[in-house]
Amino acid sequence: MEIYKKIYNSLLKLKEKNPLIHHITNYVTVNDCANIVLAIGASPVMADDIREVEDMVSIASALVINIGTLNKKTVKSMFLAGKKANELNIPVILDPVGVGATKYRTSIALELLEEIKFSVVRGNISEVKVLSGMNASTKGVDAESWDETNPIEERIRLVKSLSEKYNAVIGITGEKDVIGFKEEVYTVENGSSIMAKITGAGCMCTSVIASYCGAEENYLQATLSGVVSMGIAGEIAYEKTKNLGPSSFRTALIDSIYNLEESSFNERGKVYNA
């Protein structure tokens, strides 16, 4: 199909460019995010000191802002780097980890969205509902089970409305992913349930999306490519480790991202127009 050819072409562009992806992220998943960026074909840098973030983002091809482990210093760095990236037309990707869990976390996420132009926002259904002003509960940094059962039609409406509000690509990832920019929306049904058994699967997905954004000017195409790549890699990794456990799966996930081929998308892709 044409859509899988586009995804593979985006992957080839990424590998050829080897974009530098600047992360201001959390210290729980930082190593996995760095490794998956390397595996997909980009280069990671995890600089968050306020004295260098503007210089670092100036040489990057994309910036990830991940609010998983907030503190005063990194919050200041997020605003500085995000605004500098906007000045230089460098895409900024937001991962609003656990938004809704505390008032502080929610206020920071909303302030970031108000002061920085984000190209992409990726979160689970509970996080996106909070950003949309809806009532939602998060279980720490995970989506609540009742949010996960929301009809796909509601997720599509959320993506469209939040995309209009922030003029950004919105990605809701979960059992069924919804990715869209305004009226152009796709659903993706790739992935494995064991991805919920490792910490950082969502963070890694955001890093893969950012890697594509660093080489692909169409950020909807980049986001779709990132989500599909993670989902297919998750399926392959599960097949290789289904008799083992989550730790083996995590290693196999990074290996599977590294080994993605054109046939991976053509044979396994489950992308649908919404």
Curated annotation (Swiss-Prot):
Pathway the protein acts in: Cofactor biosynthesis; thiamine diphosphate biosynthesis; 4-methyl-5-(2-phosphoethyl)-thiazole from 5-(2-hydroxyethyl)-4-methylthiazole: step 1/1
EC number: 2.7.1.50
Enzyme class: transferase
Keyword Nucleotide-binding attributed: yes
Name the UniProt record assigns to this protein: Hydroxyethylthiazole kinase
Alphabetic keyword roster: ATP-binding, Kinase, Magnesium, Metal-binding, Nucleotide-binding, Thiamine biosynthesis, Transferase
Matches recorded under InterPro entries: Hyethyz_kinase (IPR000417), Ribokinase-like (IPR029056)
Function: Catalyzes the phosphorylation of the hydroxyl group of 4-methyl-5-beta-hydroxyethylthiazole (THZ).
Catalytic activity: 5-(2-hydroxyethyl)-4-methylthiazole + ATP = 4-methyl-5-(2-phosphooxyethyl)-thiazole + ADP + H(+)
A Gene Ontology BP annotation from the UniProt entry: thiamine diphosphate biosynthetic process
Binding positions for ATP per the UniProt entry: 122, 173
Family: Belongs to the Thz kinase family.
Native organism taxonomy: Bacteria, Bacillati, Bacillota, Clostridia, Eubacteriales
Species this chain originates from: Clostridium tetani (strain Massachusetts / E88)
Cofactor(s) essential for the protein: Mg(2+)
The keyword Transcription regulation is assigned to this record: no
A single MF term (Gene Ontology): hydroxyethylthiazole kinase activity
Residue numbers binding substrate: 46, 200
